[in-house]
UniProtKB/Swiss-Prot annotation:
GO BP annotation list: translation
Protein name: Large ribosomal subunit protein bL28
Organism: Mycoplasma mobile (strain ATCC 43663 / 163K / NCTC 11711) (Mesomycoplasma mobile)
A Gene Ontology term for the protein's cellular component: ribosome
Basic residues: bias regions: 17-26
Lineage: Bacteria, Bacillati, Mycoplasmatota, Mycoplasmoidales, Metamycoplasmataceae
Length: 65
């Protein structure tokens, strides 16, 4: 199961974990993925996996059931 937004196709980003001594080790920044129920224009409902930011936008536009 890929950690990717179904609508915007955004995925995890890479970066560095920094200790107090500023040693750098690689890490991954994952998305805050949520499963939401979206109502399509024809009235059918679909469950999709989107980031929290996308879910907030869909809710504001009135697509979330």
């Amino acid at each position: 199961m890929a950690r990717r937004d179904d609508l915007t196709n955004k995925g995890p980003m890479s970066g560095n974990k920094r200790s107090h001594a500023l040693n750098a080790t690689k890490r991954k920044f994952n998305l805050n993925l949520q499963k939401i129920l979206v109502t399509l224009e024809n009235g059918s409902k679909v469950k999709i996996k989107v980031s929290a930011k996308t879910a907030k936008t869909l809710k504001k536009q009135g697509f979330v059931a």
